[in-house]
Amino acid sequence: MFNIKNHLRLPIIGKREPEEQPDPIDHDLHVQRLRELLYGLDLMLDDDAQGVKSAFSDDTVESAVGRSGSAFYNAILGLEPKAIEEATEALYHAEQVTEERKKHFEHHDRPIGSYPAGMELQLCLSDIYLMQSALGFVSDSIVDSMKAAYRIRKTFLSFSKMMEHVRDVQHKKETGEIKSLSPNATFIDEFIESGVITGYGVLTFLVSMFPPSLSRILSLFSFHGVRKESLELLWRASKYPNIQGAIALLCLYAFNAMIQSLGSIPPSNYDQELEHCLQAVKDIRKRYSKGALWAVMEAKIYFLTGESQMALEMEELSIDSSMEQIIAMKGFDTAMLYVGMRKFKQAADAIIELEDLNSWSHAFYRYFAGCCLLQHGKEILGSGGSEEEAKASIDHGIEYLKNAPTLVQKKKKRRTLPVEAYLIRKVQKWEDRAEKLNISIADAMDVPPYAELIYIFVICSLKDPKEAEALRADLETCKCSEEDEAGLKEFLLGVIDRHLKEYDSCRVRMEHVLQLDQGYLSRDNRELWILPFAYYELAALYWDMHGMAAEKEVNHYLKKAQEFNDYDLQNRLSMLAQAATQTLQSEK
């Protein structure tokens, strides 16, 4: 007989229908997926592109996070617009799915370890925010840069809150309040702690490098970065045997080998930090034995510590890497090493090879190669070599120099890089002078352009007295018919004097440079940049002579250097001055 009760559910008066229960969360599966995430990212740092693709091939949240991390890694190494765009899209997708998963954990789960439920996903989300901010700052879009400034504040608040949790939990572990944990809980705790310490360290370090104008605005929101604290956190995080420890070491390398190596006011313990970095890189190469990036880093540090021959031997070795970005990074470092060692033909060859690997700035590659080939030709003549070979090298160099600005003009929907604005001005200045005097571009150059490249990119090579004396010899033979060229020559000789500890001569030269008229230097593509940099070099002079005893004088000259505007290399000086200011604060 048909029974309506079997086919129709009627509500029971006075009783609520039970709520639908969420799907239970499988903690073992969750931990396993996080382990697979770390494993896939380890493969990324070991140059196993196919392994990374396979590890993150499914549609889980963890794979989305892994794919976004891999895309970011590719983008930040090469800074190519297409890679940045792809990484931005991958990060956006990862953000959406991670946010949804995090909310599910927070509302329907219990903690696995010592931290609130879902905090490991909040960490992933904060890492995504941090990567998005970094891409915004290096993109060619002003709008993206503004978005990045807003997003980084959100990231800072997230990491600050998580850092409070980590400090509290680690204190309880030290006092015995939290005792032994299950394997899953131990893994989750280390996942969170290594990630939070690394992320907070990276973030506060980045903020410490912001220019003063932006730092003052951010400080109104209790948003600040102290370099000393951030570096201590990064060294602490670098001990973790996972991707987070590797990222911490990469950041330490970036600071010591890429930022400080460009400046003139290093921390008092800089040499020890480089040695510490070198040992840490050697250790991590045991973990990532196939990762070419770590070999490139090791070679660069050898160069910075004065072991140029060891660096050269490593740079000249071929590397087996599936990542063109790492091969390009190696090529760039090799070119800088060659020019620092006055191997100009090899430097030109190394930098031109990057055109087939990287689209960062073909204009700069041509300009750099042109400067090197010009000097190579001059050295052939100076040593009594073949005039035909010398002329071919000089002509080839001039061709590259003339071609460089046209490559900037061909860029579509991309801002002109500061170094491109610099090279456009230099080439235009030489062409105008050559036309005015009816001479060749090569003859229109009073100061050999490679000398500026050494100051801008390879100033560390001047630590070697032999290299400093060789550059001095080239400069002293220059005959300058233009006042700004004479000022440029005097500036570069002053820099050499400081490196050779001829401090009185350095001060006299820099003060002479500062007597040049700013209005005159601001016109006709002249060398305005030497004025602010002369103040910066005076700060470096007092730092070399007296250290923290001259804090007042160093600060004074750094502030004077930052009073100038609207000149090429302004962004570079801002970065170097901010790094120097943080050095003074860290030494107290």
UniProtKB/Swiss-Prot annotation:
Signal peptide as annotated in the record: none
BP term (GO), one: cellular response to misfolded protein
One Pfam family matching this protein: Iml2-TPR_39
Top-level taxon of the source organism: Eukaryota
InterPro entries xrefs: Iml2/TPR_39
One Gene Ontology term, aspect cellular component: nucleus
UniProt cross-references to PANTHER family, sorted A to Z: TETRATRICOPEPTIDE REPEAT PROTEIN 39 FAMILY MEMBER, TETRATRICOPEPTIDE REPEAT PROTEIN 39C
Stated name of the protein: Uncharacterized protein C11E3.14
Organism encoding this protein: Schizosaccharomyces pombe (strain 972 / ATCC 24843) (Fission yeast)
